[in-house]
């Protein structure tokens, strides 16, 4: 991949290097990405007839997360739909895909949190696919072009699905938020839902969001 050091950026109709401005979301590529996703959804549905809706959130940089609503004529159909998408062209670079109910608005991230909180059993509904294809630019991959993928089944089980006969899911005690805040290195802890605790940490020697790590990378 070429490396360019720019001193000034201008624009014209016949650009020397046509490109979008990327960086910490939201940026120009974010809105273009959502528009492209909406435009190509009918094409995807022609090849994958179970797909009802698909959304790659800007907040996760597109290739890190996909939310797919699937038809549900038989048990675990959402999982089958999600697995099919993981082999569909550039979607093979996805890291995480979440299957949701047919009536779920895939662009409503609050509804996604509700589904993850109320319908996902960690022991049964998280499927890890080890050693799958990764993007060459994926910074978190342990090896070049290889990483694990995660499929989350956040659909409501059908009556014929053994998942539908399990006990109702339980949340975490509110005291856990206070306990987590007291852990060394934890700056902030907050419940997003009754079973979802998010913590902000500070790693000693780690870069701040305002710091440029380019020189450190070159030295390494």
Question: Where do the PLM segments sit?
Answer:
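Charged, compositionally biased interaction regions
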Residues: 1-220
């Amino acid at each position: 991949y070429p490396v360019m050091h720019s001193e000034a950026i201008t624009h014209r109709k016949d650009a020397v290097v046509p490109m979008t401005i990327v960086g910490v979301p939201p940026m120009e590529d974010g809105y273009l990405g959502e528009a492209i996703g909406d435009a190509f959804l009918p094409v995807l549905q022609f090849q994958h007839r179970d797909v009802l809706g698909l959304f790659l959130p800007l907040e996760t940089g597109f290739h890190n997360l996909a939310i797919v609503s699937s038809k549900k004529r038989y048990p675990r159909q959402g999982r089958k739909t999600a697995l099919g998408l993981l082999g569909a062209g550039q979607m093979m670079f996805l890291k995480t895909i979440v299957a949701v109910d047919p009536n779920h608005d895939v662009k409503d991230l609050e509804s996604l949190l509700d589904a993850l909180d109320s319908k996902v059993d960690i022991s049964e509904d998280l499927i890890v696919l080890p050693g799958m294809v990764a993007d060459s630019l994926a910074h978190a991959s342990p090896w070049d072009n290889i990483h694990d993928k995660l499929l989350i089944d956040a659909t409501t089980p059908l009556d014929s699905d053994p998942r539908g006969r399990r006990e109702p899911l339980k949340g975490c005690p509110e005291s856990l938020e206070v306990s987590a805040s007291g852990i060394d290195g934890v700056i902030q802890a907050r419940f997003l839902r009754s079973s979802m605790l998010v913590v902000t940490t500070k790693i000693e020697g780690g870069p701040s969001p305002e710091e440029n790590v380019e020189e450190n990378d070159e030295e390494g």
